[in-house]
UniProtKB/Swiss-Prot annotation:
Coiled coil: none annotated. GO terms for biological process: nitrogen fixation. It comes from Rhodopseudomonas palustris (strain ATCC BAA-98 / CGA009). May protect the nitrogenase Fe-Mo protein from oxidative damage. Belongs to the NifW family. The gene is nifW. NCBIfam families: PRK00810.1. This is Nitrogenase-stabilizing/protective protein NifW. Keywords: Nitrogen fixation.
Amino acid sequence: MSTSAVTEPVDIVARLQSAGSAEEFFELLGVAYDPKLLNVARLHILRRMGQYLAGEDLEHLPGDEAAARCKAVLERAYADFVASSPLDQRVFKVLKDAVAPKTPKRPAFVPLDALK
């Protein structure tokens, strides 16, 4: 497990936006992670974090509270993939579409009076 202390919460959102890897997200927020799991599900975890953060209003929070909220959201997203696989979670559209019920194609209708 890798972990690091939470950095000073000076504009944590800007620091996360400039992060270049999933590992940087975990290190900036001080969240422990298993490198093997992160190698498999990094994009899925970050996408899920983004989905969870979309419902948060971090702009008006003090820096330390925003950092704590981001940390909690990343821990929640990571926990989703500890408990199940990316295939089970289906975060991305291509995975959702793979199991979506297909609408049956209706045969083309040609009324009899249109035939000559």
